[in-house]
Amino acid sequence: MNKQKLLIVGGGGMVGATAAYACALRSVIEEIVLIDRNEDLAWGQAADINDAMGIDRNVVVHTGNYSDINDDDIVVITAGAPQLPGQTRLELIDVNAKIMRDIVKNIMANGAKPY
């Protein structure tokens, strides 16, 4: 049986890192991979989560990329463009739709099979 793995696209951001931390605290998964276009930020979030977990932990948190995806993994997408001052959420739709299309294309190209 394969190890359960959660991949969080946008894992360097606040929503992705918080989701990763919550899953790590509850030990609901064995491996958490943070994927982010800002690799340094994702690495910092992974390091912070690992430090917060202490010595006695059952989960591994690290950074990775789309090639880490297998067909039995869980992928969560938390990526999106930040809202600029004065900008409405409706004005962000086109930008976030493009981001989502690019992410899904990368996920599918690396062997993910949607259910």
Identify the role of each PLM range.
Residues 23:
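Aromatic pocket-lining residues of Rossmann-like dinucleotide-binding sites
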Residues 79-81:
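Conserved NAD(P)H cofactor-binding loop of Rossmann-fold oxidoreductase domains
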Residues 89-115:
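Rossmann-like NAD(P)(H) cofactor-binding subdomain of soluble oxidoreductases
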